[in-house]
Every structure is written in structure tokens, then in C-alpha cells.
Amino acid sequence: MSNVLGFGAVGDGVADDTEALQHTLDAGDGVLRLNKGTYRITRPLVLDLTKQGIGAVRGEGGTSRIIMAGPGPAIRVIGDHQGTASPVTVQAHTWKNERFPTIRGIEIVGEHPDSVGIELRKTMKCVISQVLIRRCRIAIQLVERNRDFLLADSHLYDNHEIGLLLDRCNLHQIIVHGCHISWNKVAGIKSLGGDVHNLQIVGNDIEYNNATSGGAIVSPADLAKHPGGAEIWFDATDGTISEVTISGNTIQATVQTGGANIRIEGVPVVRPERADTPKTQTWDTAHLINITGNVLGSQWRGLDLRHVSRVTITGNTIYDSSDLSIFATHCSGIVVSGNTFSWRGLDSEITKDGLRFEDCDNIILSSLSTMRLCAGSAEAGAAVTFIRCSDCGVSDCQILDPLHRGLELEDCLRCRIANNTIVDRREKPSMRHAIRVLGQSRSNLVSGNILGGATVKLIDATGEASELRDNMLLR
């Protein structure tokens, strides 16, 4: 283990220790041990595993600080892993010289506006733990190709743009757990393009990740290309993301217009069709995602989903979404079950919360507990709104005290609204309709609901829009 003081480092936060630290990496045994102190550097420290062999960076239990006063990453780890996670694809030189680099026990502070904390390139089984990275543009950036990455027990805090960035990276088998990822000005965790699969984000506190939080040194105008910040943001408009679990996190906590607690963006994909491909089959670049057991709230939107499929949203507490709790457009195969929404305690509070689905199919809402959802207006929209959707179901939900309407279908086909309670219990009700079906809607079923408290009409569905039966209408 190479002691940096023996290679000429000063560690007083004033002297430029770049040469001494790099000399330690190049001439030492591959393990960079940072004694207690503050090490100022002006260019990246490169741990090139292809040249130096197996390596690591270790601090003294969090007492070791690196100040990055130049552009680029404070620590750059380079490997040459060219395969996947499958053992048969891992080349001998990876196991011999490059596997399992670890970085732990250090703080990295950015002084340059283009500084990055840690960059990983073509690594295999890298583990970053017990680190604090702050005031960098990006805290941790993965590029090109990486496999089996673990980030644990760390703080990515108050960075100018992003906490953890998966940057156009071919990346599988990623676990992020036990971390505090907060006060980053664009996103807490962002996947941008690339080919990302098998991502688990579990047991973290992910908060205040937008330009309005924490006294951003980059003005919101300079971040105009980033729509409002997000705690978790998957952008697969030029790539793919799938097989994702987001579970047991706190994901909140300040509103920026255009922002979201979780934003997932895909695009439709055209694939060669086999003879037996169903005509209704659609493909997209963001799919197979599980969002379970989280607390999400205090943002413009809770979840913002675009061109996403096969998503399960269960057992979450979702609250204080100033625009919408869930917005989904051009999505398919979405299950929203067993969640609670809202709790706008006072009529004097700003209007907020609601669910809206546009141009979607195969959506299921079930066993939801909602109260005082405000989405829509006196003219259009409801607490739960479907527009141009088909083959959707809403069942066994409590939609209590909605501001304008309980549920609205517009231009919808073959949707089923069954066994829900939609009532306005206020002394002076404001709900105009419990259920309204309009436009070119057809072949929809409204059955077995308990409806009450509407100021205009409990069910407004005319013509061939719906079959109505066995509903309890409370006068």
C-alpha cells in the first residue's frame, strides 16, 4: 500500500499535490492510500488498470479530502473490459489485472465548474463506498462500458448538475443502495442514452435535486435544456433502459416547474415483424420497470412517463404533486396498484395532484386510496383522466372529494370502470360529475360503483359511449 506522503504529497489544501499523487499511482503498488488531510489537484488522477494492474483508492475513514481545482474527474479509473457480465465473455487480462477496483473513505470537493468526482471507464465489478462528493458538475460518471457496478453508503451532495450519471454507457448489473443523493441541480440519478439493464435503486434518500434547491451556482436559465430537474431521470430517447427496480427510497422534496420525482422517457421502436407478431404489439426503449414502496412527493409531477411499457407502480405514498401525481403518454402495460395519493388538507391550499393518461393502452388502476385530487377544471378533466386510451381498467379505488370530477374518459375504447367509490363528502360539494364519458368514446363499461355528491350529474355518459349497470347513485 503506497503512502502518498512518502511520494511528496503535502496534504495541506494549498500545495498542488497532483504530481505527487499521480507518482504514487504510477510508481507504487497500485493502492493509493490518502492519509488524513486535504489534497489539492489540478488535473485527473488516472488509475489505469491496464497498465498498473489491480488497484484501489483508500482514505482514512472519511478524513481524506481531494479538492479538484481543474476540469474533468478527480479520479479516473480505466479498464479494458470488453465483454458482458457473463463469465465466458470476460477476458483473462480483466481477471488478472483489472477486476474489482474499489474507492472508499474519501471526500471529493470540486472547485472548477467542469470538475467531476469519479469517472469509470470499461471497469468490471467496481465498488464505490463511503465517499462524499460535492460541488462538482457531476459526482460520479460512468462512460463507454462497465459491468457489475456497486455504489453504497455514500453522499452525492450539492453538485452543480448530476449526482450519478450513466452517460451513454453500455452498462448492466448496477446496484445503488444506502446513499444520500441530494441537492444536485439537474438530477440525483440520471441515465442518458446507452444500453442500461438490471439497475436496482434501493433504500436511498434522494431529495431536492433541481435548480431551485440549495443556492445553485448555475442559474436556472443556464439549465433551460434540463426540464425542471428530477430525483431519478431515465432518458432512453437515444438508447435503452430496462429491468429496473426502484424500491424503498424517499424521493422528494421541492417543486420546480417541469420537474418530476421520477421521469422516464423512451421512444417507439420499429422492429422487423414476424408472421405471428400481434398487430397490437408495440415496442419502446424504456420497459420492465418496478417502482415499489417509495415515498414520492413535493415536485411538479410525481411520475412522468413517456413511451414506456411494462411498468409496475405499487405500494407507494405519492403526495403534493403541484401538477400531476402521475402523467403517462404513449405508454402500455402500466399497473398502478395499492398506492396512496394526495392529502391536500385545506381547501385554501393550492390545487394539486391527479392522474392523467394520454394515448395509452392496457393500463390498470386498482386499490388506490385518493383524497382531494384537484386535476382538471370546471370544463374538462378529472382527478383521474384518460384521453384516447384503450383497454384500460379502474377498479376498487377510493376517489374521495375530488375538486372537479372523479373520473373522465375522452375518446376512449373498451375501458372498464368498476367497483369504485367516488363521492364528494364536503359540506359544500364542488365535484361536478363522479364519472363522465365523452367525445368518441365507445364500448366502455361502468359498473358496480358507489357515486355521490355531484353538483351537476353523477354519471354523464350518453349514446354508445358506455354500458351502465349496477351502480349505486347516492342522492
Language-model-detected regions and their locations in the chain:
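Right-handed parallel beta-helix/beta-solenoid
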Residues: 1-20
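Glycine-rich, low-complexity segments
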Residues: 1-5, 414, 468, 474
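N-terminal extracellular ligand-recognition/capping segment immediately after the signal peptide
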Residues: 8, 18, 26-72, 80, ...
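Parallel beta-helix/beta-solenoid
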Residues: 29, 49-52, 56-60, 70, 77-136, 202, 245-251, ...
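Extracellular beta-strand/beta-solenoid scaffold signature
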Residues: 42-47, 69-94, 111-120, 134-142, ...
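Leucine-rich solenoid repeat scaffolds
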Residues: 431-475
